[in-house]
From Swiss-Prot:
Encoding gene, per UniProt annotation: mutS
NCBIfam families from the UniProt entry: mutS1, PRK05399.1
Molecular-function GO term, any one: ATP-dependent DNA damage sensor activity
Pfam family, one: MutS_III
Keywords: ATP-binding, DNA damage, DNA repair, DNA-binding, Nucleotide-binding
Protein's name according to its UniProt entry: DNA mismatch repair protein MutS
Length: 870
């Protein structure tokens, strides 16, 4: 049986009727239905949870004549199971008991208090500390795609628009945890999403409404116009924002009070980084999908999670305009000069103010998060004083570390020094903050002292020496008197229980105390919740101030991390110039260099790279394993690091304007999308020749190797010509086709270089030593047989390969002529004129009368019709 809302409710028990009504409101979501100490799932939800979580599936009783299939998870273990479901891409609605069990007639009232989805997770245990969890909405309007994204745990809100070609690049750049799309078919969007592993949620198309989105954005940002955010002209993004904000508010069950700023990111403002570039340069993930070793893992020595998230954003969103990068370079230099390590040490104890602020707004913050916030706010003055003021950026960030003092004051007064982990455990509100709470706590905590005092007073009053005042859970508080002393009992004693050897009584004073004591703990917890809510209420107006502090701390942490990396790894400050050039002196691959240092693999060999207006392409040849790909990647990484505002691994660096980094490296089949090695190679190459400009950096590694030799050689030559002559992009073109070393002879802006190697002749055969140096001119040979020997190929196989190679080389040398790949195409043979062309050639317009001209026109028309039939 499924949880079908259309099923007649009258056939079900009252509780199942309630459940089915809730399930009908969340048909595509797993519903966790609170029942006492468990969250239960029913019917198809239970079967699915059993499969995903490996929890027990059972059935209990009947409803509508069928067994009720169910599975449950304990309340105390909710976060664990919730995390597993969200990681599997599931969305979960949590239905809590909101009614009073004591007064309920029928099932206690329940309602969904929040919906947890992969893109709207805010629970600390379910979030990655160093990655922002983004919810993205995408919709198409004519030729443009509108994008709107939200980091619910950080309060970030962004908009953009792009064309079909850039869509996959935006998905790679943002890395969303969940994508909202409308329920219309869109082949391009489906294709772009197929390259990701993100959770996909379809929403009705009417929710993606431009006017609604504009209105919701204005309401969210509390403005009358979006002009102040430069967001008036992105109507497709407004439509995406309508669905995004509605969905986020629905999942949280409340307004998003902490979202108060908006960033509009335009593709023309950012350095273009297509998905292949993210993948091939291993920016945030290795080619195997691991988090390290990557460029980000090398850079990220941040002290806080929010610093790590800021650093990741800088890396994946580098700007074409260099203003922000220059400011960061200046700040890094100042921190390297003085104060950087002191600042990093001060940041060590800073809490995640960004996420705590979001959880305050969503009223999900835990007591110990507030104590962490309090400690951070109290440490800000000393931290602020330690920030160097030698750069404008650092001075501005330091100035933002001055939140209103009443925030820390409130937290000091209201929250205990060491509160319980959860509010429900009590002991959260500080003693002295509320007199009523202190009294209730006093009753509960001083119960034993009161009983001893009452016992002493009653013994003295009655003269009964063995009188005892006690408590048990069945009868509550009582005064116990043995049967032999009953005649001394005062008149105000009321009999509560008769035992064989004693009588138990209660007095008005003890009854009054009992009423207070038995309910004191419950009332104290209720009072604490009320006071805690009051603290959160008081913090709501301070969310913007806390957000500013969080952003400043995150930026300082990221800058201090980059300064530490620059100092430890011996990086230099790049110079930006207006002339077209990429000039790198003694450049290194940062990740490879670090790995060599870690593993004791020797020193990295640095290399120069010079590209300018008259030198736009390097044709790179040399042996496999010689370092061609490493050299190409290191040039791209130096350019990217400079653009994000980092120092770079080089002795010196001058960079002109760069608008994109395109890469075609690697030969792995894309089996998931039914693309062979060669098809993937050509698809990526096509995207590059269509998208690269004279300001782009292009890496082409071994293009054409996925097909036959002649096909591959012809295509490689044509692609090189296109990039050199038409795109005019800065290009590093590595190839195993030695015929392409003739390319620079007819292309003046191209130059041959090679990675060097040396041979040594031993009794075991020719050995090869890779020197990893980039030197002028083409390589003399590829050393493929020597590399095969290093790989462990059998000696007989190597002898056969060497003999075949020598024969082929001799055959090539004896060839009388070679194909010129770069000559103009040969002229086509002359073609015999058609009857229509001959008739047209015989017409003399200047000698025709009007009548003759009309006849000629009809004759030509007739010949044309006949030619189509043939």
């Amino acid at each position: 049986m499924s949880a079908d809302p259309a099923r007649a409710e009258s056939g079900h028990t009252p509780m199942m009727q309630q459940y089915l009504r809730i399930k009908a409101e969340h048909p595509d979501t797993l519903v966790l239905y609170r029942m006492g100490d468990f969250y239960e799932l029913f019917f198809d939800d239970a079967r699915k949870a059993h499969r995903l979580l490996d929890i027990t599936l059972t059935s209990r009783g009947q409803s509508a004549g069928e067994p009720v299939v169910m599975a449950g998870v304990p309340v105390h273990a909710l976060e664990n199971y919730l995390g597993k479901l969200v990681k599997l891409g599931e969305s979960v609605a949590i239905a809590e008991q909101v009614g009073d069990v004591a007064t309920a007639k029928g099932p206690v009232e329940r309602k969904v208090v929040r919906v947890v989805t992969p893109g709207t997770v805010t629970d600390t245990e379910l979030l990655s500390e160093r990655v922002d969890t983004l919810l993205l909405a995408v919709t198409r309007q004519r030729a443009s795609y509108g994008l709107a994204w939200l980091g619910l745990s950080s309060g970030t809100l962004g908009l953009s628009e792009c064309g079909e070609r850039e869509l996959a690049g935006w998905l790679a750049r943002l890395g969303p945890a969940e994508v909202l799309v409308d329920d219309r078919d869109d082949a391009a969007l489906t294709a772009a999403l197929s390259t990701t592993r993100t959770a996909l949620t379809r929403r009705p198309a009417w929710q993606f409404d431009t006017a609604l989105g504009r209105r919701k954005l204005c309401e969210q940002l509390r403005v009358a116009s979006l002009a102040g955010f430069n967001a008036e002209d992105v109507s497709a993004a407004h439509a995406a924002a309508a669905a995004l904000l509605s969905y986020a508010e629905h999942t949280q069950g409340r307004a998003l009070a902490h979202v108060g700023s908006l960033a509009v990111e335009r593709a023309s403002d950012l350095l273009e980084l297509p998905p292949a570039t993210h993948r091939n340069l291993e920016l945030t993930q290795t080619l195997r999908g691991e988090d390290a070793p990557t460029l980000l893992s090398l850079l990220d020595v941040c002290r806080t999670g929010m610093g790590s998230r800021a650093l990741r954003h800088w890396l994946t969103h580098p700007a074409r305009v260099r203003t922000a990068a220059r400011a960061r370079h200046e700040a890094i230099g100042a921190l390297m000069e003085r104060g950087g390590e002191v600042l990093r040490e001060a940041l060590r104890g800073v809490s995640d103010v960004e996420r705590i602020t979001a959880r305050i707004a969503l009223r999900q913050v835990r007591p110990r998060e507030l104590t962490g916030l309090r400690a951070t706010l109290l440490a800000l003055p000393a931290l602020r004083d330690g920030v160097p003021r030698d750069s404008a950026l650092l001075a501005d960030l330091a100035q933002q570390l001055s939140p209103p003092p009443e925030i820390a004051d409130l937290l000091q007064r209201a929250i205990a020094d060491e509160p319980a982990v959860l509010l429900r455990d009590g002991g959260v509100i500080a003693t002295g903050h509320d007199a009523a709470l202190d009294e209730l706590r006093g009753i509960a905590q001083n119960c034993e002292a009161f009983l001893l005092d009452l016992e002493a007073r009653e013994r003295n009053r009655t003269g009964i020496a063995n009188l005892r005042v006690q408590f048990n859970r069945v009868h509550g508080f009582y005064i116990e008197v043995t049967q032999g002393q009953v005649d001394k009992v005062p008149a105000d004693y009321q009999r509560r229980q008769t035992l064989k050897n004693a009588e138990r009584y209660i007095t008005p004073e003890l009854k009054a105390f009992e009423d207070k004591a038995l309910s004191a703990q419950e009332r104290a917890l209720a009072r604490e919740k009320l006071l805690y809510d009051g603290v959160l209420d008081a913090l709501q107006p301070q969310l913007a101030a806390l957000g500013a502090v969080a952003r400043a701390l995150a930026s300082l942490d990221a800058l201090a991390a980059l300064a530490e990396r620059a100092a430890v790894l011996n990086w230099c400050c790049p110079e930006f110039v207006s002339q077209p050039c990429i000039e790198i002196e003694q450049g290194r691959h940062p990740v490879v260099e670090a790995r060599l240092a870690e593993t004791g693999g020797g020193s990295f060999i640095p290399n120069d790279c010079r590209l300018d207006a008259n030198r736009r392409m390097l044709v790179i040849t040399g042996p496999n394993m010689g370092g061609k790909s490493t050299f190409m990647r290191q040039v791209a990484l130096v350019v990217l690091l400079a653009a994000m505002g980092s120092y770079v691994p080089a002795a010196a660096c001058r960079l002109g304007p760069v608008d994109a980094i395109h890469t075609r490296i690697g030969a792995a089949d894309d089996l998931a999308n039914a693309q062979s090695t060669f098809m993937l190679e050509m698809t990526e190459a096509a995207a590059i020749v269509h998208g690269a400009t004279e300001h782009s950096l292009v890496l082409m590694d071994e293009i054409g190797r996925g097909t036959s030799t002649f096909d591959g050689l012809a295509l490689a030559g044509a692609i090189a010509s296109q990039l050199h002559d038409r795109n005019r992009a800065f290009t590093l073109f590595a190839t195993h086709y030695f015929e392409l070393t003739a390319f620079p002879e007819k292309h003046p802006r191209a130059l041959n270089v090679h990675v060097s190697a040396a041979e040594s002749h031993t009794g075991h055969g020719d050995d090869i030593v890779f020197l990893h140096e980039i030197q002028p001119g083409p390589a003399s040979r590829s050393y493929g047989v020597q590399v095969a020997r290093l790989a462990g190929m059998p000696a007989p196989l190597l002898r056969q390969a060497r003999a075949t190679l020598e024969a082929l080389e001799a055959q090539q040398a004896a060839s009388a002529s070679q194909i010129d790949l770069f000559a103009a195409p040969p002229p086509s043979p002359p073609r015999e004129a058609t009857e229509l062309e001959r008739a047209l050639a015989g017409v003399e317009p200047d000698t025709l009368t009007p009548r003759e001209a009309l006849d000629a026109l009809y004759r030509l028309k007739s010949l044309h019709e006949r030619s189509k039939e043939n």
